[in-house]
């Protein structure tokens, strides 16, 4: 694959899916259950997330991802870009002031949070 002819990470991902066998392992999550996701599983989840995200945002909207390092982070990131959004990843280790600054600066249309125990400051942005 000549990646110099590709325009985005999304395009690279979907080109790669054409080259690999769908059942081939792609992502492994070591916590909590050491689950392995194959290319087919991941692509299906990305398409489903893309459809949902497209129904919630407009082209160019910023979408925040608050998540640990896990397979769904990658799936969400690709789905946001595939839906025409701009991914704004933030770490779970940030302080409340960091979150507030980022939220005020980027004004996301969508916030994806991996677990309900992860919280952001509660106010309208």
Question: Model-found features: residue ranges?
Answer:
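A short N-terminal helical cap/helix-turn-helix that marks the beginning
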Residues: 4-26
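Conserved AMP-binding/adenylate-forming core of the ANL superfamily
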Residues: 26-70, 74, 78, 95-100, ...
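Structural motif
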Residues: 67, 113-115
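Structured binding elements
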Residues: 84
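Short beta->alpha connector loops at strand-helix junctions that form conserved
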Residues: 90-92
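Conserved small/polar residues in nucleotide/adenosyl-binding loops
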Residues: 116-122
